[in-house]
C-alpha cells in the first residue's frame, strides 16, 4: 500500500501548519515525522490517516476511502480506550471492527504486552503506562498494512519503552509504519525521516 500526498497543506485560520508537502509512503518501510513540540507533527499524521481534511492539495491511498479504516491502525495520546471494559473485552470489541493478527489469540496478545495480571480489571484502574500498552496493542496487533504511531512511548517507563521496541521489531516488519515523534527511542528503527519544519 502506498500513501501519496501532493502539494498538501493544512491550516487553522490564517496559520499554516504545513504546506507544499509532497511525499509518498510505501509498504515495507518505516518513517519518522520529526520536529519540535507544537510544530504540527500530530496534525500531519492525522491528515495522513484521513482523520483531518487537507486545506489544499491531494491525498491518495490507491483504495476506496470508505474501506480505509480496515487498512490503518493508530495509537495516539489523544485517542482514548473504553475504560469501562477490561483489556480482554476491549480487544474483542476492537476485533469486531478490525481483525487482529491471525497467529495470536487475544490472551497471547495480552501476554505480549505484559498485562496478564490486569487482564480482568477495568481499564479505568490501569496506570497511564498500562493504558498506553493497551493503545499500542490495539494498533500493532491489528492485521492491517499501515500503522500510525503518535508519540508511542508516552507514559511508558524504561521497561515499557523496551517492550515497545520489541513489539515493533517482531510484529511490524513488512508493514508501513509512520511514527510522529521527537524522541529517538520512539523512532530509532525508522528508515526514513521527514522533518516537518521543511514544510512550513
Language-model segments: which ranges?
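Conserved ABC ATPase "signature" region
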Residues: 103-118
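Helix-to-loop junction immediately C-terminal to a conserved catalytic motif
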Residues: 49
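Conserved ABC transporter NBD signature motif
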Residues: 54-70
